[in-house]
């Protein structure tokens, strides 16, 4: 956490996915990495806001930030194999758990990093402005 700007950088992310029987390991890795990248967005950047008339304020990629490879940490992934009894090859869908699990994992890591300031909860997205305002309120901003 940058105390001067409030920017949060995820430096390392470890994820283990239960893939069932793996048919193509490269596709599985790509799905997990893609799911994790899609989880970084709602955790740190993506917020849908509306104006007083109910119109979406950030309705284009010019003003709606989606993370790129530059914002993604070093992924450390592994797989466990528990064959699905509901598929003839024992395969399972993969990547979705990373998308769903990443935002709360990142939020918990940020709250833990700020716990020495008495922080116990932050709503996502955990934007730099939110973090900087919190640091300022706690007297910890640079």
Give the ranges of each region predicted by the language model.
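Cofactor-binding beta-sheet edge motifs in enzyme active sites
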Residues: 1-142
């Amino acid at each position: 956490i940058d105390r001067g700007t409030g920017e949060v950088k995820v430096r390392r992310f470890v994820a283990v996915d239960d893939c069932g029987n793996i048919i193509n390991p490269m596709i599985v890795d790509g799905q997990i990495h893609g799911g994790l990248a899609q989880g970084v967005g709602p955790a740190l950047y993506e917020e849908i806001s509306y104006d007083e008339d109910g119109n979406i304020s950030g309705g284009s990629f010019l003003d709606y930030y989606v993370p790129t490879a530059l914002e993604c940490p070093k992924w450390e992934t592994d797989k466990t194999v528990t064959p699905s009894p509901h598929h003839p090859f024992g395969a399972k869908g993969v990547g979705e758990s990373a998308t769903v699990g990443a935002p709360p994992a990142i939020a918990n890591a940020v709250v833990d990093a700020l716990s020495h300031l008495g922080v116990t909860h932050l709503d996502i997205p955990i934007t730099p402005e939110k973090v900087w305002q919190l640091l300022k309120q706690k007297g910890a901003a640079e």
